């Protein structure tokens, strides 16, 4: 189980990313449209003035049960360890163990 503070920090980053997503996207579109370099520098300054944690690259996918940051499966939102336990307990419909 991950520390609760780390899970809360990740939730805070998600909220910031959602809040500033439209501003960040519109300013990036402006950069491609503006021909002069000085105007581009001004827009870059606006981008840099946004909070650091509002960047989507700062987000990290975590297991929603344990908060584990590694070995996450996107389809289920679970870490590999928990996914395996739930499949063995038949808690995930349609998931089967592979055998060959």
UniProtKB/Swiss-Prot annotation:
Pfam families, alphabetized: Ribosomal_S14
Protein name: Small ribosomal subunit protein uS14c
Annotated family: Belongs to the universal ribosomal protein uS14 family.
Region (Disordered) location: 1-31
Biological classification of the source: Eukaryota, Viridiplantae, Streptophyta, Embryophyta, Tracheophyta
Chain segments annotated as transmembrane: none
GO molecular function per UniProt: rRNA binding; structural constituent of ribosome
GO terms classed as biological process: translation
Localization of this protein: Plastid, Chloroplast
The keyword Plastid belongs to this UniProt entry's keyword annotation: yes
PROSITE patterns, sorted: RIBOSOMAL_S14
Assembly information from the UniProt record: Part of the 30S ribosomal subunit.
Highest taxon in the source lineage: Eukaryota
General function of this protein: Binds 16S rRNA, required for the assembly of 30S particles.
GO CC terms of this entry: chloroplast; small ribosomal subunit
Encoding gene per record: rps14
Keywords for the protein's UniProt record, in alphabetical order: Chloroplast, Plastid, Ribonucleoprotein, Ribosomal protein, RNA-binding, rRNA-binding
SUPFAM superfamilies according to UniProt: Glucocorticoid receptor-like (DNA-binding domain)
């Amino acid at each position: 189980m991950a520390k609760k503070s780390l899970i809360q920090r990740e939730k805070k980053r998600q909220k910031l990313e959602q809040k500033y997503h439209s501003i960040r996207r519109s300013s990036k579109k402006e950069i491609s449209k503006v021909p002069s370099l000085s105007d581009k520098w001004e827009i870059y300054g606006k981008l840099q003035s946004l909070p650091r944690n509002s960047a989507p690259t700062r987000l990290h996918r975590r297991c929603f049960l344990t908060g584990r940051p590694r070995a996450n499966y996107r389809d289920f939102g679970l870490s590999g360890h928990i996914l395996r336990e739930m499949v063995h307990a038949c808690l995930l419909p349609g998931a089967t163990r592979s055998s060959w």
